[in-house]
């Protein structure tokens, strides 16, 4: 589109015309000497005045040619517009401003040029490596062309430069060009052709004074080095398939076309892909196949010859030449035929024994099912396929084994520390048993192993076992007993070939070291609390059972707590107590005797025949204590000079022919570990008159009677004590004696 340019006289290319109408003022005008205008654009020249209210303006060219523009006056401004700029506007223009009698005139030179478009790059043909090509650079509608300079570059390399300095015969817009011929190479790929044009008009100011165009080089390479790969082979079986892959070098990458050469030499297009796959090939698919790589600058071809051969039928038997099966499983043998439309099948064993299976035919496949498979099926089986006049036979061997369960580990009894136990490891229903090995481990140590290498009389499922006896200890607790069974059949592939069972050992310990602790003591006073604590070692920890032994020897159960407590012991609680530690491995027993003591009581101290006797009489002093066992009896005679311990027998002291000095206080002390009790009496001895020996008949009778009665009384007292009291009495010998 044409541009519009406004030029104002004065500063910055503006034409100012200043008129001073005042009698004392002067008019001055400031303007640039030149202005540039491009042909086809619009330019406006504006003339302005100051200092005059009503100036008048006029425009003309310096040579009085037509203005070729429109003038518009507004106040102090006058504008000359050239729309569009043409060669007729290339003049020096004058603006005259009149204010009263004053006139002022200024001029401006309008320079005309044309440089509207970037250069154009043209190629004589596609850029092909190794082939020359002509590059033309065009600059259209340029003026003045004698100021034009053109450069053509390939990347940063200058190919050609040209100036147009010939004189112009007339003013006109010209199209100028620069031509260069060069041969592209691989190194030119990705480079750019640059056409640069410069309009050298330094005397005037305009933009742009330089234009350039860049064209990226699209360098082509004609297809070459075309090659073909064939998979699996160029010789094929009828019904097979083939994949042919073609590749060709070039730039841009060539497109691949596959064709087949007909008998008349023409090509039959098959595919536009690089890979051609032919399936279910027939004999007529034999022939020559052509691959062509094609791009914009050429093509390159390669041929391959395919030969399709007649294919014979084949027989396959699955799952393979050998099948490993476990007795009791289901086995399916499959015989398949290919490349035969109507085959017939037959099955047999290699030794012509019964098949013992079910045969089924479906099209090109026949199956023999053995379910469940047993020892009678351990044979080599043959499948015969007849197709027309041809027969093919394939065989498969059925090998059997039986190893269905993990070993079974059993103990002859409970594991008790120190007691022998027999371990049995049994492997059920194994075949062939002569390949079996059983190993017995305790922890990681093998303790027994056994192989069964004896010949088998017949094919059968066998149950084999390994036994051993060992003495467990507490160190065995936590260890693992492992029974490992291995079926050594290396020539057969199956899993598992070894099985194992484990049993963690827990060794019991029969109760032992049973102890009883009585607190505070096994002998206590009546009313005191008693704790009897029982403990016993063993695995598992023994249970505690408290019992009391009765008078008939039997045990009376009391408690299953380790601690037996009597909060207030009574005398009848005395006796034998039994603690038993019991677990599944045995029993341990401990007895303790508990004695409940009672402080002495009911003491009786008597003098016989009386506490008052005559000198010469016989006196028995007797001390008894009721129903208390293990009591000490001490008889004393009190005196100021000190007590005298009397020699008593069963608590009785006899004084024959009592004397006056025998009179006094007699004391009985009854004590045991629970306490003591005292009793005393005063014996009064009266003297005889005249202090003469007197022996009357009456005294003789009394003496004789007392000699019989006193021992009798003593015996009565003794047996009464023994019958009615729990305990015994002591005679005091010097100090005291315990009975």
From Swiss-Prot:
Recorded coiled-coil stretches: none
Cellular component terms (Gene Ontology): extracellular region; plasma membrane
PROSITE patterns reported in the protein's UniProt record: IG_LIKE
Annotated glycosylation sites: 76-77, 273, 531
SUPFAM superfamilies: Immunoglobulin (SSF48726)
TM helices/strands, residue ranges: 699-720
GO MF terms held by the record: integrin binding
Cell membrane keyword on record: yes
UniProt keyword list: Cell adhesion, Cell membrane, Disulfide bond, Glycoprotein, Immunoglobulin domain, Membrane, Repeat, Secreted, Signal, Transmembrane, Transmembrane helix, Ubl conjugation
Signal sequence bounds: 1-24
Topology Extracellular: residue spans: 25-698
InterPro entries: ICAM_VCAM (IPR047012), ICAM_VCAM_N (IPR003987), Ig-like_dom (IPR007110), Ig-like_dom_sf (IPR036179), Ig-like_fold (IPR013783), Ig_C2-set (IPR008424), Ig_I-set (IPR013098), Ig_sub (IPR003599)
GO biological process, one term: cell adhesion
Disulfide bonds: 47-95, 52-99, 137-195, 246-291, 335-383, 534-579
Domain of life: Eukaryota
Post-translational modification (record): Cleaved by the metalloproteinase ADAM17 to generate the soluble form. Sialoglycoprotein.
Boundaries of every Ig-like C2-type domain copy: 25-105, 109-212, 223-309, 312-399, 408-506, 511-595, 600-684
Sequence ranges on the Cytoplasmic membrane side: 721-739
Function field: Cell adhesion glycoprotein predominantly expressed on the surface of endothelial cells that plays an important role in immune surveillance and inflammation. Acts as a major regulator of leukocyte adhesion to the endothelium through interaction with different types of integrins. During inflammatory responses, binds ligands on the surface of activated endothelial cells to initiate the activation of calcium channels and the plasma membrane-associated small GTPase RAC1 leading to leukocyte transendothelial migration.
Record comment regarding domains: Either the first or the fourth Ig-like C2-type domain is required for VLA4-dependent cell adhesion.
UniProt-recorded name of the protein: Vascular cell adhesion protein 1
Gene that specifies this protein: VCAM1
